[in-house]
Amino acid sequence: MTHSEYRDEYCGAVTESLIEQTISVVGWVHRRRDHGGVIFLDMRDRAGILQVVVDPDTPEAFATADAVRPEYVLKITGRVRRRYEGTENANMTSGHIELLAKEIEVLAKSETPPFPLNDEKSTVSEDLRLKYRYLDMRRPQMQDRMVFRAKATSAIRRYLDDHGFLDVETPILTRATPEGARDYLVPSRTRPGNFFALPQSPQLFKQLLMVAGFDRYYQIAKCFRDEDLRADRQPEFTQVDIETSFLNEEEIMNINEGLIKHVFKTMMDVEFEKFPRMTYAEAMRDYASDKPDLRIPLKLIDVADLMKDVDFKVFAGPANDPKGRVAALRIPGGASLSRKQIDAYTKFVGIYGARGLAYIKVNDASNINNGVDKESGLQSPIIKNMTDDVLVSLIERTGAESNDIIFFGADKASVVNDAIGALRQKIGLDLEMTTCEWAPLWVTDFPMFEETEDGRWTSMHHPFTKPKGSVEELKTNPESALSIAYDMVLNGTEVGGGSLRINTLEMQTAVFEALGIDDQEAEDKFGFLLDALKFGAPPHGGLAFGLDRLIMLMVGASSIRDVIAFPKTKTAECPLTQAPAEVNTKQLRELGIRVREKVQADTSKPAE
């Protein structure tokens, strides 16, 4: 029991073991019901809900119960008893018992909340929920998610502690480094015109901890990125940050795979087999994504070689373009899709840059070896542009059967991958094609660099990732270089990513050169790291998990905002505190900052 001045046990933890005992509980009134002279109060705390019965035999308690309203804070003392037969609630831990009240004390009254807290089905705008987040988090679903997160985080710590990792804190105020997103800057009062940056990750500091000899490090770290927000993005987020020395790629992956297995087993009693692995090239070829959802048994099939000579520029153009791709996606049973559904999918792929969505309905594939019946066997506006040989080859290569549909993507490879990869995921979920609840995997062997639109190289992960091969090989063929990097994917979501790191000055300099970072820029931005590499840096590597994203998947939430206590909106604002906000002139003057007025566009005249 949980003894204190106020209570003996949590409401949700009162069970049959306490029958006939007198106890005190505290909490909020979840519901109040008056049934023919007997008042029922559902009392709620973080552990759950307890039914309290108040009858007229205790007139003082009855009068108090008659006056209370939802969200009043009460202390109730009474006797635990078994519920009458037929009134049990198997969905509640306390569903077989109730508390017969003797005394009720009002600890705090409540105004009527701006939205109901006892109806999970009520539709409430997210902005209103975030404005009154302290009320929103009283809802049982939010309480459960916050408790789940806390326990999962504890399980993570226990696993890492048991495996010899040390929890070491790294600075929040650091310097700006290019890691792919804009930094949040903090002005220095003591050095006017200079700024700290909030860390996008503890990357460099954890590498320095390896140089310092702390060979197994972890941290539940706050990270900050000033970027456009999506369902799985926040300006501040939490990362399970891990780094090790003297372990190879396989050993690091095994430790982190074990961590996820431990958390799922501890929290959900879910057991995983060994995670499958595929290379980045295989993932892009078969799933058009570097984070494929393997619950969905659909694969893309390359058909560019069949389309090089067709009388259809939409296909022939990309088929003959070295940077193009023509891919087919077969949907079993998809011939039943309506014109309206196909139009909706066409609109969907347009979001990703596709200029249309070609398809062939396979109504009858029974006589495919005897040629193609274009009248009844296949149905599509595009088949008139293809020979029978091409159509037969398409059906055979995709394995299409009667009543299937084949969708096509034909464009630059990047557009096809984005559009058809997303279509694969959407159709798989829309048509309920998932074959299992959880599908983890590792994706490995990422390209070291990717080319920008202006022809420069940029790091696919970050510039401290160790490449495969030698310095000479990197300098000779940077476009072919692969990194010793690995991402953990779960149900189509990247939950973690890591790599081996560069631990020699020679290789780090070569990578900077490939990225167009000259010696002076490297010294200015990363001089402290380059210096550290001169003093015996051990072979090291690590990984970071997005804690918010992992918890979101585990509890089935639709957004990480639903598993963060006080999240920001999609516009990086906090409706609760009204942050960000203006500060007074005195504070700005102390920091040597002057705010420029935004120039308002003249909207009185039409644009020319």
UniProtKB/Swiss-Prot annotation:
Residues reported in the UniProt entry to bind ATP: R225, D226, E227, Q234, E494, G546, L547, D548, R549
Catalytic activity, EC: 6.1.1.23
Region (Aspartate): 203-206
Annotated Gene Ontology cellular component terms: cytoplasm
Catalysed reactions listed for this entry: tRNA(Asx) + L-aspartate + ATP = L-aspartyl-tRNA(Asx) + AMP + diphosphate
Subcellular location: Cytoplasm
Functional summary from the UniProt entry: Aspartyl-tRNA synthetase with relaxed tRNA specificity since it is able to aspartylate not only its cognate tRNA(Asp) but also tRNA(Asn). Reaction proceeds in two steps: L-aspartate is first activated by ATP to form Asp-AMP and then transferred to the acceptor end of tRNA(Asp/Asn).
One matching Pfam family: tRNA_anti-codon
The keyword Aminoacyl-tRNA synthetase is annotated on this UniProt entry: yes
Family statement: Belongs to the class-II aminoacyl-tRNA synthetase family. Type 1 subfamily.
EC class of the enzyme, as a word: ligase
Record's subunit section: Homodimer.
Residues annotated to bind L-aspartate: E179, R225, H461, R501
Keywords: Aminoacyl-tRNA synthetase, ATP-binding, Cytoplasm, Ligase, Nucleotide-binding, Protein biosynthesis
GO biological process, one term: aspartyl-tRNA aminoacylation
Coiled coil: none
Name recorded for this polypeptide: Aspartate--tRNA(Asp/Asn) ligase
One term of GO molecular function: aspartate-tRNA(Asn) ligase activity
Principal location listed in the UniProt entry: cytoplasm
Annotated positions for site Important for tRNA non-discrimination: H35, G86
Biological classification of the source: Bacteria, Pseudomonadati, Pseudomonadota, Gammaproteobacteria, Moraxellales
Superkingdom of this protein's organism: Bacteria
